[in-house]
Amino acid sequence: MKGSDALIMALRNMAATLGVYDLMEVRVFLERSCRFVQERYRAIYVDAYMSMVVDSVLDLKAGFSGTPEMDDARYSLRDALKRLDEINAPTIVGLTVLYRTYVKGEPLHPPGTPFPGGFEVEKKDGVHYCPVKDKQSDNPEALCDICIARQSPLP
């Protein structure tokens, strides 16, 4: 079994064990993580992240059969697991981050996620760009180092 197949199988097995309590736990985690986000963006972020979490779990429970993006990953799976442990991420957050990054090849902020200054995450020519990736490099709670998005070019 290839490493990518093993990862998908492990994520599917994890998703099968998740329930309502896990969703409540992730909601609390997200609200706590976003406590310093400007108020007008906070609800948007929490709702977007909750949607990603639910979609990821449902995809995995339904037997998502996409092509893993692990070969193109810029951040090792081992390092990603270490970072998730450092921030005490609930299991469901880890599942979502690993699924979106290493299986679906998607950024951790969905395209269209707004940021102060009128900027947002964009996808151009198959590449995801984030306007705040470099600015979050010193934030110990941010997972930007795991995310596949690149820093948006300066306007």
UniProtKB/Swiss-Prot annotation:
Pfam hit, one: DUF2115
Family stated for the protein in its record: Belongs to the UPF0305 family.
Classification via InterPro entries: DUF2115
Domain of life of the organism encoding this protein: Archaea
Lineage, uppermost ranks: Archaea, Methanobacteriati, Methanobacteriota, Methanomada group, Methanobacteria
Official protein name in the record: UPF0305 protein MTH_811
Segments crossing the lipid bilayer: none
Family matches, as HAMAP family: UPF0305 (MF_00763)
Species for this entry: Methanothermobacter thermautotrophicus (strain ATCC 29096 / DSM 1053 / JCM 10044 / NBRC 100330 / Delta H) (Methanobacterium thermoautotrophicum)
